[in-house]
Amino acid sequence: MFLRRLGGWLPRPWGRKKSTKADLPAPEPRWVDSSPENSGSDWDSAPETMGDVGPLKTKDSGTRRPPGAAPESSRDLKVDQLGSKRMDSLKRDKTASTIQEPARLESGGAIPKLDWDPVDSGGVKNLGVSAQGRLGTIGPEALLEKPGRRQKLLRWLRGEPGAPSHYLQDPEEYLQISTNLTLHLLELLATALLALCSRPLRAILDALGLRGPVGLWLHGLLCFLAALHGLHAVLSLLTAHPLHFACLFGLLQALVLAVSLREPVEDEETADWESEGQEREAKEQREGPGRML
């Protein structure tokens, strides 16, 4: 053991071997901000010098990050800033569109249709105006549905515009239906009374020997008086129960109106069928001699 130690102290002719590893420079002491605001404790209030401190605490985030994460955090911040700018621009566009909508409605202009455009380079979708909203206009006629036959009849009954043409061809003629119905009813009543009293009165006058012009005059006068008393009796009965007879008259008038309103349509259909039949007969007559040849 003594010889080995002695050999280590003796000089060697070839010299000592240099260490292949380069001496690393000593780490410089760094100042660490350990104030109570950042650390949250009073023990870190005094400044400290550390040899190898490592990553420092950032003021924005209380967590420690490695030194290689700095560029990534800067990229994240840029992306967040771009996204916030895009969202602000979208909010401004929405507010502008909401402000412009009532003005467009008042002026009667078409409102463009908003839809989503394809993704842009930033990866955010933008609102755009479709081609249909720019070119096409929505009119009131497109929103209204085509009225049916019942709706047309109701419009005609209410007197609203847009009723079918065949209902309004001759309005005076249709208005005379109710008056003609009353006239026909009174006429039927009077003729029935005259038919009941004419024959008996004529037989009585013949039995009395009243013939010739005097007998005819007396026959007419007596028929008038009999019809007048009969109408008075019938009208007194009708006025005694007006509600019942009014319902019967209304039902009868509704049936007459339904029949009279359908007549023009049926007449047009029959006229069309007759014209088609005549055309077919004419074609057959023309083709007949050609086939014979």
From Swiss-Prot:
The keyword Phosphoprotein applies. It comes from the Eukaryota. InterPro entries: DUF4661 (IPR029073). Residues 1-114, 268-293 are annotated as: Disordered. Residues 73-95, 277-293 have a biased composition (Basic and acidic residues). The modification Phosphoserine is found at residues 34-35, 89. This is Uncharacterized protein C6orf47 homolog. It comes from Mus musculus. The gene is D17h6s53e.
